[in-house]
């Protein structure tokens, strides 16, 4: 991963790039700092640790946010993350706004469509705070999702068989981007 980030930094394509180290948040922050990433995605910023550990997690985010200039995208009730919070989802979303620059929403697993109901709940709670759909985005659902979300992170849809282990398929990228353009033009 470091080799790719070093290449992107040194080549200076003029396009934003970022990093996601899944559940290794410190490594994500360190790579984002070292390679001048424009953004950093974290699987969870609240609710995934025991309540007694929330103050430590908050201190972790305050420390790294003071050192890192990247736009931090943080998951709340994110796929594969335990929900150990004693708070409502609405309360955790409010906490998230102090730990990241944009909230990521997913359903339960990679490639599974994120329900419009969950996206709407997050949007209503977050108001104008940036919201990104980060699982299950397809050409068929992107228009309805972008009515509520500010953007999307797409992985498995772009790959052969729409599986996260597949190779990148340019045709799938084009299909989704055509649907995004159509959705943008209709608003």
Language model features: what each stretch is:
Residues 10-21, 67-81, 121-135:
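Short beta-strand/loop segments at the ligand-binding rim of alpha/beta enzyme cores
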Residues 44, 76, 107-108, 135-137, ...:
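Short secondary-structure boundary segments
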Residues 8-16, 64-70, 99, 178-187:
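A structural motif corresponding to the C-terminal end of an alpha-helix
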